[in-house]
Each structure stands twice: as C-alpha cells, then as structure tokens.
Amino acid sequence: MAATIYYENDADLSHLKGKKVAILGYGSQGHAQAQNLRDSGCEVIIGQRPGSANYDLAVSHGFEPMSIAEATKAADVINVLLPDEVQADIYRDSIRDNLSEGNVLMCSHGFNIHFGQIDPPKGIDTLLVAPKGPGHLVRSEYEKGGGVPALIALGEGASETTKQIGLAYAKGIGGTRGGVIETTFAEETETDLFGEQVVLCGGVSELVKAGFDTLVEAGYQPEMAYFECMHELKLIVDLLYEGGLSYMRYSISNTAEYGDYVTGPRIITDETKAEMKKVLEEIQQGEFARKWISENRAGAPFFKATRRRERLHGVEQIGLGLRRMMNWIDEKEV
C-alpha cells in the first residue's frame, strides 16, 4: 500500500494562528523547530531549564525561555523535545498538571506516549511530527528554502482539527516542502528503535569492531584495519545516501561488487535475520522499553559502564591518532 504523503498545498498555517506553540527543550530538534516556526510567523515560547547551555542558546536566538511548567501553562500546542529518558518524569512533575482541555500534546519521537510513560488526561489530543533529519539540517534546509521530509501521526481518538494543526506545524518547520508521510505512533516508534538497534547503531558498531578485531588478530597493522573497516565506511554510506544500493554498486569496483554478492550473505545469514526478528518482537512487546526505563530508574549503571568500556576499544584508540592526520576532518572528541 502506497504511503499517504502531504505537501505544501495540503497544509495551512492558519490552523496555528492565534495559538501559542511551546517548544520544551532547546536541543538539536528544539532550536531548529522553534526558529523555523517563528520564521513562518508562528508564536513560539520556549521551556528550558535555567542555567543550562541550551537556555543561553535560546536567549542568544532572541527567545525569552521560561520554565517547563510556565511554558506548558501558557501554550495551546506543546511539543516535548526533551531526551526520551527524562520525558516521563518531567511530564509528571511539570507538564501534566499544567495542561488545559483542548491543548495538543506533541512529540517528535513516540517512545513515551506509545509505551505508556506519558498518558495525557481526557481532552488532550496527542500528535507526532518527526523530521527525518537532525536539527541542524532541519534549520539549514529551511533557511535555503527547502525542507527535510517528516512524519505525522495522530494519537488514539485525536480529531481532524488536531491533524490540521499537525500539518500546519509540519509546514511551519519546512516539512511539507519535502513531503510529510502519514504513519502511526506504533510504526514510528517501533521502526525507529529497530533501525537504531539492528542497523544504524548496534549493527554497524558491532560489524566495525568485529572486522577491525579480525584483521588485527590476524597480524595486520591496526592502522590498516581502521582504514578498511571504519574510515572508508563514510565513502560507502555517502553513496547509499545519494542513490541507494544500486548506485553504491555502480560506483565501486567490480571486484568490490562481486565480493559484496558472494560474501555479504555469509556475514548476514538466515540466523542473523532470525535474531533481527526476535529484536523486533522485543520492541513490539515493550520488552526493550521496560529494560531501558528500568535501567534509567536504577541510575543507568550498565549503560554508563558500557559506554566507558566501549571508548577503550582498539578501533577507538587507533582512530584518535589517525584522524589527526586528516586536516579536512572537523574532528570531534567526547
């Protein structure tokens, strides 16, 4: 079934006229969406904790940030753009009791609403508008007259009026210039988590480390292993980004393409796909969400320890030195 996609003519900014939009959290998505909405003529207020770098950033962008509670109370449309792991507590402490009937509660990732960590009271519609790109790209494309495609989803029982508000919001941030795909909270949340865990983050990280370790353990120089298993990944990803698998294969050597066909299926096997299906089931059934919520309530000991350990892996250590040889890279360290 073909996706339903909305464009500029399908959305009307007048549905936000006379409404105050609160952006809660002035991070990557918050700063981009807030500025784009303001430039589109919408009335925007910012909820951000005083004393933080993002508070100062909002001030430098011409906003007058207030507390989360104050921004919620003052707004008609409230978009929660805070980190997933803190949303539920902040919702209970500062948002829930400051909502008024008829408000629209928004997010750009459905984790907390889909998994029941945020359960709005009766009379509050929920809405998701999710740009499919990082905040800096959402902002820069808007400024150039373009827009990053986005997703839109309505919560259970949400009205047609809320849908029109969502489309207006998407237009205000530039989404309808690229196209806004209709989805559901479940689909956005579950596919997002699956992609992160199986391919984009978990899958790629483990593939890179395993490839690097295999070469080093076989006696090859770690510098060579880094180039072949980490550094050159960007070249391939850029080709995929621009033209998909076919363009990538068109652009590489015939030797590399042949190796792709004969060796790829030996690495990603039927057993791998079966494990992917298990991961998807765990996401769908809420098992991953329960683990992540429990981890954070305990102070995130596993998460923090694993983060520290992963930074000591050989591919990370050798990369620090090699990237300093590449003056065209805007090197980042954490």
Swiss-Prot record:
Pathway: Amino-acid biosynthesis; L-isoleucine biosynthesis; L-isoleucine from 2-oxobutanoate: step 2/4; Amino-acid biosynthesis; L-valine biosynthesis; L-valine from pyruvate: step 2/4. GO terms for cellular component: cytosol. It catalyses: (2R)-2,3-dihydroxy-3-methylbutanoate + NADP(+) = (2S)-2-acetolactate + NADPH + H(+); (2R,3R)-2,3-dihydroxy-3-methylpentanoate + NADP(+) = (S)-2-ethyl-2-hydroxy-3-oxobutanoate + NADPH + H(+). GO terms for molecular function: ketol-acid reductoisomerase activity; magnesium ion binding; NADP binding. Keywords: Amino-acid biosynthesis, Branched-chain amino acid biosynthesis, Magnesium, Metal-binding, NADP, Oxidoreductase. Residues 3-183 form the KARI N-terminal Rossmann domain. Binds 2 magnesium ions per subunit. Its EC number is 1.1.1.86. Substrate binds at residue 253. NADP(+) binds at residues 26-29, 49, 52, 84-87, 135. The active site is at residue 109. GO terms for biological process: isoleucine biosynthetic process; L-valine biosynthetic process. Pfam families: KARI_C, KARI_N. Mg(2+) 2 binds at residues 192, 228, 232. NCBIfam families: ilvC, PRK05479.1, PRK13403.1. Belongs to the ketol-acid reductoisomerase family. This is Ketol-acid reductoisomerase (NADP(+)). It comes from Rhodopirellula baltica (strain DSM 10527 / NCIMB 13988 / SH1).
